[in-house]
């Protein structure tokens, strides 16, 4: 031994040093494996039983549903993005077909991430201004108590958050004025101008009117139509989940689901499953809060009982 001291503690560390290090590394690996297995089991339970996606004894059934919902149809071969080539299965009549095996894998991944972020109570924003997805974006956001932009993405909505907050405040004041009938006392021209301004702001900002904090998760259904939104997410470091067709850029998304974004049935199917994942996450966080409150109450009653017994003894 190179080091020797009278201290028995140091001597023990000296002797068992290399062995203990090996032991801890093996132990850490075993713990990591266990943790991964637990995570996988939880993920499977969430996706199969709670979210009810891929909940069939015959896995072919899931692919049949995906085919019925037109998830596999891509864009013409000429419009294909180089980054999307690995997600393509084949082509017919000059149009690409998306690989549904990969789509299913990415849907499962997306559902897990959405459940996790919803459990953490993160602000979720849905973005989809294309005609097939606009309606479903609004309904999904309302169902999950999230926020949405489905008419037009105003440039700098995320970059210039301060100016957006000012616009939201302006909309609130205009709505209050209309409710309190203040415009009746104003000249006719000014009253009409204020009404038009209120209607214009509502058209663009109705989905994010009640937002309090900065959006932490963005779900996009039409990347080609909302490219500025995708670029802003990338610039601001906001986690972005996108439904990507064969003509989209996967580099602008943190997580993607390769699927048809032009079909209403395809977008509706995906958003329906996303909504279930968010609802599951929110429900789990509510349960956690309730359990925490129960535990704190129990602790308080125990401590009170101990104090009471001590006082009695005295």
From Swiss-Prot:
PANTHER family: 30S RIBOSOMAL PROTEIN S2 PROKARYOTIC AND ORGANELLAR, SMALL RIBOSOMAL SUBUNIT PROTEIN US2M. One of its GO terms (molecular function) is structural constituent of ribosome. Belongs to the universal ribosomal protein uS2 family. The keyword Ribonucleoprotein applies. Pfam families: Ribosomal_S2. Keywords: Chloroplast, Plastid, Ribonucleoprotein, Ribosomal protein. It comes from Stigeoclonium helveticum (Green alga). GO terms for biological process: translation. SUPFAM superfamilies: Ribosomal protein S2. It is found in: Plastid, Chloroplast. It comes from the Eukaryota. The keyword Plastid applies. GO terms for cellular component: chloroplast; mitochondrial small ribosomal subunit. This is Small ribosomal subunit protein uS2c.
